[in-house]
């Protein structure tokens, strides 16, 4: 941990508890700040409040009182999920109070080697693969943190100058991280996500580009080269560009040619040996390979990781095989692109479980993939009618169900030996579940109840 004094004696407001907010509040106390912690909700667990107050932190819950804007805070550390049009946040913006996220705080105290990953899809898998690959050859600590469910600042506290930290960073986190400066930045892809938060696609892209904003030619931007738009986005970086390409559009970084993965012209391994399924995971592997090779990792270490790593929970996760049916949990697929890619990973007939929060879009784009890959669909949630329309256009039998739990026995009734039963909703979970993780866990529980087996 790097010693800094910029918070000594400063008044700091932490907005939003959560894992990152609580850790940030305690860290700020260590850094000498006078900390107030505020959450709009009232925590069900009183231990959270007790722990904060025991550290000398003033706690305000149940509201984001606008009066806090008049208390002379020097800095606001905001939960990434709180939008900037929140009245209290907007008041701080208007008066020019610096607003950062916990990721910025983590960067400020970190003095090791930083690798950061962002993108619309594939962030967590790429982050995990990169950390595992670098750790295989490392003589010092290699950890991961960030949007992967582990506080950036908490891990940064425990690492030294020779250690490496691989961070997954969302657009929400990056928007409040103005000085972050990874030596290696990775952009897996950029689609049109979270426009309810960012308002426009350009705002979303600009938030993502904060990952490379402070890089120089001595740093590296690893970026997907398979779309012209992404190549143009790369030109906005001052870093040395290192492309990765599944579609063989560049030989300057990592790429695939005739089923073989190459790094700058040298063979690494065949794509068929990657344990993770699907073209999206080839792309994730290519991104991780590029970062690993830039970090001095050997091909043997890369092969070891890619031939053994079976995936991240809720991300095209293999659950089990039962009576010759394969069950997969892809609850993290909360947009059309993710489900489109997931379907392309299977060469067996798919019984698709899809639906969720209605964000106002329709699903015509999925029709060709339904025609090619989907045998039947079970639809649920707010957008089930729109999902049903797309299934009907594809000529696929569609059954309506209440949710991802009740859909499991319905899918079983329609399945035959050799089929895949896949939860890949193409929508957020918030109409029925508090998170995609809970939705995925409940799906797995339903599969376990149906089969009488535990997930593998």
Curated annotation (Swiss-Prot):
Alphabetically ordered keywords of this record: ATP-binding, Cell cycle, Cell division, Cell shape, Cell wall biogenesis/degradation, Cytoplasm, Ligase, Nucleotide-binding, Peptidoglycan synthesis
**Places the protein is found:** Cytoplasm
User: Which Gene3D superfamilies does the entry mention?
Assistant: Mur ligase, C-terminal domain, Mur-like, catalytic domain, NAD(P)-binding Rossmann-like Domain
* InterPro entries with a match to the protein in the record: AlaDH/PNT_NAD(H)-bd (IPR007698), Mur-like_cat_sf (IPR036565), Mur_ligase_C (IPR004101), Mur_ligase_C_dom_sf (IPR036615), Mur_ligase_cen (IPR013221), MurD (IPR005762)
Key word Ion transport present? no
The entry's cellular-component GO terms read: cytoplasm
A Pfam family reported for this protein in Swiss-Prot or TrEMBL: MurD-like_N
- Binding sites annotated in the UniProt record for ATP: 119-125
- Give EC number(s), comma-separated: 6.3.2.9
A GO molecular function assigned to this protein is: ATP binding
Keyword Magnesium in annotation: no
Instruction: Give me the reactions it catalyses.
Output: UDP-N-acetyl-alpha-D-muramoyl-L-alanine + D-glutamate + ATP = UDP-N-acetyl-alpha-D-muramoyl-L-alanyl-D-glutamate + ADP + phosphate + H(+)
Instruction: Tell me one GO biological process term.
Output: cell wall organization
What's the family?
Belongs to the MurCDEF family.
NCBIfam families registered for this protein in UniProt: murD (TIGR01087)
What function does this protein fulfil?
Cell wall formation. Catalyzes the addition of glutamate to the nucleotide precursor UDP-N-acetylmuramoyl-L-alanine (UMA).
Protein name, as recorded: UDP-N-acetylmuramoylalanine--D-glutamate ligase
**Taxon lineage:** Bacteria, Bacillati, Bacillota, Bacilli, Lactobacillales
């Amino acid at each position: 941990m790097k010693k800094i004094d910029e918070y000594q004696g400063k008044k700091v407001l932490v907005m939003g508890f959560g894992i990152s907010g609580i850790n940030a509040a305690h860290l700020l106390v260590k850094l000498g700040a006078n900390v107030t912690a505020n959450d709009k909700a009232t925590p069900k667990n009183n231990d959270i409040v007790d722990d904060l107050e025991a550290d000398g932190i003033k706690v305000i819950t149940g509201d984001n009182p606008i009066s806090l804007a008049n208390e002379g805070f020097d800095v606001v550390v905001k939960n990434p999920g709180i939008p900037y049009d929140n009245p209290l946040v907007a008041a701080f913006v208007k008066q020019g109070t610096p607003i950062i996220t916990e990721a910025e705080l983590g960067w400020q105290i970190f003095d090791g080697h930083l690798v950061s990953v962002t993108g619309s899809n594939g962030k967590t898998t790429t982050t995990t693969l990169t950390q595992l690959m670098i750790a295989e050859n490392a003589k010092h600590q290699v950890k991961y943190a960030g949007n992967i469910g582990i506080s950036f600042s908490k891990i940064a506290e425990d690492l030294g100058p020779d250690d490496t930290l691989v961070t997954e960073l969302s657009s929400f986190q990056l928007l409040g991280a103005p000085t972050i400066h990874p030596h290696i930045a990775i952009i897996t892809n950029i689609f049109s996500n979270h426009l309810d938060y960012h308002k426009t696609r350009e705002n979303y892209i600009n938030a993502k580009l904060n990952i490379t904003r402070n890089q120089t030619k001595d740093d590296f931007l690893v970026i997907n080269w398979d779309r012209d738009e992404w190549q143009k986005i790369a030109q906005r970086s001052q870093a040395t560009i290192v492309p990765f390409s599944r579609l063989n559009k560049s030989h300057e970084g990592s790429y695939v040619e005739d089923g073989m993965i190459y790094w700058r012209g040298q063979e690494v391994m065949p794509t068929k040996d990657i344990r993770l399924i699907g073209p999206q995971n080839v792309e994730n592997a290519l991104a991780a390979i590029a970062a690993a090779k830039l970090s001095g990792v050997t091909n043997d270490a890369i092969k070891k990781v890619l031939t053994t790593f079976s995936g991240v929970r809720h991300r095209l996760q293999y659950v089990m095989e039962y009576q010759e049916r394969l069950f997969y949990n892809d609850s993290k697929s909360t947009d059309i692109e993710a489900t489109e890619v997931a379907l392309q990973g299977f060469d067996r007939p798919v019984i698709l479980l899809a639906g969720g929060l209605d964000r106002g879009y329709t699903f015509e784009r999925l029709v060709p993939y339904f025609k090619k890959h989907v045998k039947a669909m079970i639809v649920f949630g707010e957008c089930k009618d729109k999902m049903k329309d797309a299934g009907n256009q594809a000529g696929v039998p569609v059954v309506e169900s209440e949710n991802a739990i009740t859909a499991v026995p319905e899918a079983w009734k329609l399945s035959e030996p050799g089929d895949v039963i896949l939860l890949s909703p193409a929508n957020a979970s918030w109409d029925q579940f508090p998170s995609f993780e809970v939705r995925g866990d409940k799906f797995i529980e339903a599969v376990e109840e149906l089969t009488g087996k535990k997930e593998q």
